[in-house]
C-alpha cells in the first residue's frame, strides 16, 4: 500500500462497507455474465463481496481503501493501519479483526454494537452516512468494475469533503489536492469541467 497523503486521528469512526464483486467491461472465460441487481450466489460475507475499509476523523479527513474480498483479516487491517495515528479514540462495531491494529497503535476503542449504545458523542453516524453516499453513487453509476474501486473510493472521499462548497471552493480544493501530482497548464479548461456532478 502506498503512503497516504494524510492520516486520521483523535476521534475516529471505523467500519466496513461491502459491495458485490463486479468485472464490468471484462469478459472472463467460463464465468457467466451477472446482470445488474442479481444477488451473489453465496450467502453472507464471501469472496464475492469486496470490502471497503473506512476510517473517518470527524469534521476533517476520510480514508477508504479496498484491500481484500470478504471480511478483512487482521493483516489487512494492519496494512490499512498506516493511515491511523497512534493513541486515537476509535469507535467501531463489534468486529474483533481490529484488535491487533488498535493494540499496535496504542488506541482506545469504544465498541458500538447497536443504535441503543449510541449517544451524542459515541456513534457511527458519520461513517454510515459516507457508506450511504457510496451506495447511492454506485447505484447511479450502475456498478463499477472492482479493479477500479480504489479510484472510485478517492472520488467518493473528494465528494464527501466538498459537500456544501460552491464551485470556486471546489476548484481550489481540487487544485490543492493535485498540487504535487500534475501540472495543470490551462486553468480555464479546468473551470469549465463539471468535476463533481
Where are the predicted features?
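Residue-level recognition of single "structural anchor" positions
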Residues: 1-197
Amino acid at each position: 500500500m502506498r503512503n497516504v497523503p494524510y492520516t486520521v486521528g483523535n476521534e475516529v469512526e471505523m467500519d466496513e462497507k461491502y459491495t458485490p464483486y463486479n468485472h464490468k467491461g471484462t469478459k472472463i472465460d467460463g464465468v457467466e455474465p451477472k446482470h445488474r441487481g442479481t444477488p451473489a450466489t453465496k450467502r453472507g460475507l464471501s469472496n464475492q463481496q469486496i470490502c471497503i475499509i473506512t476510517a473517518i476523523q470527524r469534521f476533517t479527513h476520510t480514508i477508504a481503501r479496498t484491500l481484500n474480498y470478504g471480511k478483512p483479516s487482521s493483516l489487512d487491517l494492519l496494512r490499512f493501519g498506516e493511515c491511523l495515528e497512534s493513541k486515537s479514540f476509535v469507535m467501531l462495531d463489534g468486529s474483533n479483526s481490529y484488535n491487533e491494529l488498535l493494540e499496535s497503535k496504542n488506541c482506545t476503542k469504544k465498541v458500538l454494537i447497536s443504535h441503543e449504545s449510541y449517544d451524542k458523542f459515541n456513534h457511527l453516524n458519520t461513517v454510515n452516512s459516507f457508506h450511504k453516499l457510496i451506495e447511492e453513487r454506485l447505484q447511479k453509476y450502475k456498478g463499477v468494475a472492482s479493479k477500479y474501486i480504489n479510484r472510485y473510493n478517492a472520488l467518493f472521499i473528494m465528494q464527501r469533503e466538498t459537500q456544501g462548497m460552491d464551485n470556486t471552493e471546489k476548484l481550489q480544493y481540487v487544485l490543492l489536492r493535485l498540487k504535487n501530482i500534475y501540472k495543470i497548464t490551462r486553468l480555464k479548461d479546468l473551470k469549465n469541467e463539471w468535476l463533481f456532478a
